Amino acid sequence: MYKRQVKDDRIIGEGWHRKYGELHAERDALSKCKEDTNGATIYVTLEPCCHHGKQPPCTEALVQAGISRVVIGSMDPNPLVSGKGVKYLEEHGIKVEGCVCNEECLDMNYVFFHYIRNKEPYVVMKTAQTLDGKIATYKGFSKWITGEQARENVHADRHRYAAIMVGVGTVIADNPMLDCRSTAVSNPHNPVRIICDSRLRTPLDSRIVKSAGQIPTIIATCSTDSDRKSLYENAGCEVIITKESEQHVDLKELMHILGEKGIDSIILEAVSYTHLRAHETSQDL
């Protein structure tokens, strides 16, 4: 979500909500204002929140800052807000103009709207293939079938999403870090790493497990091997156990669990099987 503050036809502050749990866009914009905000207008893509969650209510911050007018792009579908933010502002003497560019804001904040309405992450599938439709060389190598620009785009995408998901086969074959090393964005954000590993085969000496203390890492499994589970947890990984679906992790249940954890978006980077499983349940994702 994005916010801009204007006073005397000048922009005096801009802000945005970077990720779940951090400053909301209104408070981010206010924190960047180096002059008096009394009497200013704030333009917001989403109705300001009015409840206590990971962050305090933005409506209170706007009142305290002396904002006189709020222009809202779209209403918040969250039942905790949904019109209550507008009501609070109006009750405190702030002029409100609502839904001035609703469709554009829906497109801009598609991840948020999907998450709020479905209580599950928005999932994007990423794949790479050769001109003749292959996802790897005839020897099974898939790491370098794309060019430098495509790999940079992948890292930029990782910055945009809350989590990245792969199958255990990718970890065994490529031993990836699954971090964000984008040079196109400042302060790149490492997504939560999720490995779908039905039988807990992820190598304990893999780069992902060894760096679990630095980057949040989740292993999703349907295995009940408590000893093996403890080894991953001792290494810093979180282990999620789902019911079994055709001898594999139940993706529907996993999406529900991840949604409850506040993970609103996932980029799925995986070889054919995990893509197939995700595609089969896509209507529910």
PLM-predicted stretches and their roles:
Residues 1-5, 274-281:
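Conserved small/polar residues in nucleotide/adenosyl-binding loops
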Residues 268:
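Gly/Thr-rich phosphate-binding loop signature of adenosyl cofactor/nucleotide-binding cores
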Residues 114-115, 124-131, 135-264, 273:
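Active-site ligand-binding patch in enzyme domains
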Residues 22, 86, 100-128:
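Proteins enriched for Cys/Gly/acidic motifs involved in redox and nucleic-acid/cofactor modification
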Residues 3-8, 127:
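Short beta-strand scaffold segments in enzyme catalytic cores
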